[in-house]
């Protein structure tokens, strides 16, 4: 192989057995059958390609350091490796697919592929009544279903013009169950994030306390998840007996658990090494990408809709908005831990504000008869109780039948309502054409928007830090794809 021979011509010579190959006697290379070498004058002997005739044809053997040159492979620094992470991957928080372009251990490009969990929730709402739509929307972000219910019902109540008619007790209970679910959501983030970084104790602790919160929500709503508890006009039912006592017991125990998390993780060298100065995104980057929630507050901007654009009477509660300045994964961890403590304060204030009263608006043309729920003593089954609630006239029975089967009508119009979910701004754009079903329901899910920050968080970093970046954003793919 001469110095002026190109790779392609050399390859052709090897493939076709061109005349520049020199034959060798049978067995000359210690192999039975004709053998030879391919090369030319002045070729370095270490770069010679030898061949052997066999029953299956000519077999070539390349020695030396020229394998990449013969194959035409580019320089090592120009190599491009594309790796798929997901959609079936334990560290992507659902069916999220990440297409990573890497050089060595450095990520040069991150592309997100979503849609694997699309269920058509928004479209399904257009074929159900205003109340039935809650059953679909509660399944969007399945780690914070009560926030989806609350944002949607607040939108419907604005269209109906009954925001001020919602009973105070119903509003207080709404705030209380939302803050309990905020704690549960952050505990899932702590548990899954700890598991992905190898902190299995954090996983056990996080899910242990989350079970306690889910037990409370099951006691109150009847279900651990996907509650359909918040309805247009109020709530599906009142608090059961013993709920307040169980919540107070949880409030007495949870602060000690949060201190345990700090003792376990905050000063842990490996935990800090994996998170400090990793996946940094400053406030300007968050604003440019539309990022909200703990990711934005960890960059130093105290934007919390409970304070900046209050709803459900949040302006009357005493609580702080935790922030940090570093904008890295460790700052997001600290912000979420502090938020759990602030949510405990709000729940405690809710218990102090609970007063006897209804949990549904008085307008029977809108409200389902929540009083028909079966109590622990069996009330709700007796004919006398049903007569008391429903009345005895045929008109009352007809009205109830039409309310449940056909639904109430909502005046034509459109509203956008946003609330602060565990992951950021959760917005609902609800459109009515004056009928008994929504004309359009669009969800501004915070996980969908926040995921757009993942390339900015991960590009230029290590492959191992991609897991940390996705975990620090805390996406829920049910809300992303819906």
From Swiss-Prot:
| Compositionally biased tracts (Low complexity) | 1-16
Q: Write down the membrane topology.
A: Peripheral membrane protein
Where does the protein end up?
Answer: Cell membrane
Q: Which GO terms describe its cellular component?
A: plasma membrane
Which EC number applies?
7.1.1.-
**Reactions the enzyme catalyzes:** a quinone + NADH + 5 H(+)(in) = a quinol + NAD(+) + 4 H(+)(out)
From the UniProt entry, list the residue stretches annotated as the region Disordered: 1-48
Question: Where does it primarily localize?
Answer: membrane
Family annotation (Pfam families) = Complex1_49kDa
According to the lineage, what is the superkingdom? Bacteria
State the SUPFAM superfamilies in the record: HydB/Nqo4-like
Which portions of the chain have biased composition (kind: Gly residues)? 29-42
Q: Which UniProt keywords apply?
A: Cell membrane, Membrane, NAD, Quinone, Translocase, Transport
Please give the subunit comment from the record.
NDH-1 is composed of 14 different subunits. Subunits NuoB, C, D, E, F, and G constitute the peripheral sector of the complex.
> NCBIfam families of this UniProt entry?
NuoD (TIGR01962), PRK06075.1 (NF004739)
What protein family does this chain belong to?
Belongs to the complex I 49 kDa subunit family.
The protein, known as: NADH-quinone oxidoreductase subunit D
Native organism is Frankia casuarinae (strain DSM 45818 / CECT 9043 / HFP020203 / CcI3)
């Amino acid at each position: 192989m001469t110095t002026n021979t190109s790779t392609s011509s050399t390859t052709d010579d090897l493939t076709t057995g061109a005349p520049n190959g020199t034959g060798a006697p049978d067995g000359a290379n210690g192999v039975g059958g004709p053998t030879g070498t391919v090369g030319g004058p002045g070729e370095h002997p270490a770069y010679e390609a030898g061949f052997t005739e066999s029953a299956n044809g000519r077999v070539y053997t390349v020695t030396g350091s020229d394998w990449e040159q013969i194959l035409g492979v580019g320089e090592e620094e120009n190599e491009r490796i594309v790796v798929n992470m997901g959609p079936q991957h334990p560290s992507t928080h659902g069916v999220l697919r990440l297409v990573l372009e890497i050089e060595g251990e450095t990520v040069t490009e991150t592309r997100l592929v979503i849609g694997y969990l699309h269920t058509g929730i928004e479209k399904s709402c257009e074929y159900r009544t205003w109340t039935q739509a809650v059953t679909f929307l509660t399944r969007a972000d399945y780690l914070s279903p009560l926030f989806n219910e609350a944002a949607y019902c607040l939108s419907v109540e604005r269209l109906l013009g009954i925001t001020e008619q919602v009973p105070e007790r119903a509003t207080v209970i709404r705030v209380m169950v939302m803050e309990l679910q905020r704690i549960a959501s952050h505990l899932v983030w702590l548990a899954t994030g700890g598991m992905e970084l190898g902190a299995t104790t954090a996983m056990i602790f996080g899910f242990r306390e989350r079970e306690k919160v889910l037990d409370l929500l099951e006691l109150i709503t009847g279900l651990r998840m996907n509650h359909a508890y918040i309805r247009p006009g109020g709530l599906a039912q009142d608090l059961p007996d013993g709920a307040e006592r169980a919540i107070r017991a949880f409030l007495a125990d949870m602060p000690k658990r949060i201190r345990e998390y700090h003792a376990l993780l905050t000063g842990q060298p490996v935990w800090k090494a994996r998170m400090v100065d990793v996946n940094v995104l400053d406030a300007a980057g968050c604003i440019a990408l539309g990022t909200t929630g703990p990711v934005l507050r960890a960059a130093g901007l105290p934007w919390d809709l409970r304070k900046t654009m209050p709803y459900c009477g949040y302006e009357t509660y005493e609580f702080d908005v935790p922030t940090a300045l570093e904008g890295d994964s460790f700052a997001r961890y600290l912000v979420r831990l502090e938020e759990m403590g602030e949510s405990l304060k709000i729940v405690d204030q809710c218990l102090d504000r609970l007063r006897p009263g209804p949990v549904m608006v008085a307008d029977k043309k809108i409200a389902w008869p929540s009083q028909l729920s079966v109590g622990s003593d069996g009330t709700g089954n007796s004919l006398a109780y049903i007569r008391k609630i429903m009345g005895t006239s045929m008109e009352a029975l007809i009205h109830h039948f039409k309310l449940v089967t056909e639904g109430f009508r909502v005046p034509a119009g459109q509203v956008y309502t946003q609330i602060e979910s565990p992951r950021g701004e959760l917005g609902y754009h609800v459109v009515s054409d004056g009928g008994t079903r929504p004309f359009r329901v669009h969800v501004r899910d915070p996980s969908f928007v926040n995921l757009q920050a993942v390339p900015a968080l991960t590009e230029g970093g290590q492959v191992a830090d991609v897991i940390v970046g996705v975990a620090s954003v805390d996406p829920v793919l049910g809300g992303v794809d819906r």
